Design a protein with these regions (language model features):
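A structural signal for conserved, well-ordered secondary-structure elements
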Residues: 1-302
Length: 302
């Protein structure tokens, strides 16, 4: 199998990561995220059609009636429509929306009308941020316990790198960020960590077994040995996500986009961030070999 010099390209990879992070951070600071109803609060109306309608027609009908900041998507089947309105709750809004849609001659049934308060949205936003921080903290403790603290630093930097780039992409293109996307971001953390752990495990074993101290060469061998597994896993995952993106409907469209970005970036970071960072952190063979106990030499003496 061909051997790729991954570590030889690490400076180019670091530059690429730095550029992506800079763009993501600038976008998050300037444009911020386009938060969905789950975080901002608003009204949710679900209606059922006798035959599948055109989403653009539904949106245009409501906009013509004076509704603003409308999100229209299918919910489950093509004839079930979910309408999100960024407005204060009106107990009659469900019936108003239904009457407007019926005016076009369609058979429309109101399924439900719910309101998500702004305070609830703020709580969800705070809890989701706290949950992400807790997840990263647990990951750092796990990697430090299973490997060594330098591995933990590399893993955490890689995960933060992945999360920022996914969030930055959603900010840059103003794709709605809701609870399903948050779930995808947490899934990206798990996926990226899994890739990183596999590469780390091979690096650790190669360091222990190798008779040379050329760390870049040892890292290259480890990454090349796990490359086929990494590409196979990422490739099959991307195929499934593409199917979800095309066939899954609007409800999981943004979820699939977040995972597609995350899987691609996570595969990159497991090699060029998590692993390559071990070189400037000066990982050495002695870091992975337990120090001898003081009384071991005395016990071996006759």
């Amino acid at each position: 199998m061909r051997q790729f010099d991954f570590m030889g390209k690490r400076r180019l990879a670091f530059t690429t990561s730095a550029v992506m992070l800079l763009i993501a951070l600038v976008s998050l600071a300037v444009q911020q995220l386009s938060l969905g109803l789950d975080f901002t609060g608003g009204t949710l109306v679900e209606v059922s059609y006798h035959t599948a309608p055109s989403l653009d027609t539904v949106r245009q009908t409501l906009e013509a009636a004076g509704f603003q900041d409308i999100s229209v998507q299918t919910f489950g089947t093509a004839d079930e429509i979910l309408i999100r309105l960024q407005q204060a709750f009106d107990p009659n809004v469900g019936q108003q929306v239904t009457d407007l849609l019926r005016a076009g001659g369609d058979q429309v049934t109101l399924v439900r009308a719910e309101f998500v308060g702004a305070q609830v949205g703020e709580q969800l936003r705070d809890q989701s941020g706290l949950g992400m921080l807790v997840a990263l903290g647990v990951v750092m403790l796990y990697v430090a316990f299973r490997f060594q603290y330098k591995f933990a630093v590399g893993a955490i930097v890689a995960l933060i790198h992945d999360v920022i780039i996914v969030l930055g992409a959603f900010s840059l293109f103003q794709i709605e960020f809701d609870l399903t996307v948050l779930a995808a971001v947490l899934a990206v953390i798990g996926y990226s960590l899994n890739d990183t752990i596999i590469v780390y495990d091979r690096i650790r074993e190669n360091i222990r077994l190798s008779r040379i101290d050329d760390m870049p060469a040892i890292f290259n061998d480890a990454i090349n040995q796990t490359l086929s597994r990494t590409l196979a896993t990422s490739g099959t995952t991307i195929l499934v996500l593409l199917a979800l993106l095309v066939l899954g409907g609007d409800m999981i469209h943004n979820f699939a986009i977040a995972l597609l970005i995350g899987v691609g970036v996570g595969t990159f970071s497991s090699i060029y961030v998590a692993s390559a960072l071990l070189l400037p952190l000066k990982l050495q063979r002695t870091d992975l070999i337990p120090a001898p106990k003081e009384n071991e030499d005395a016990e071996e003496l006759p």
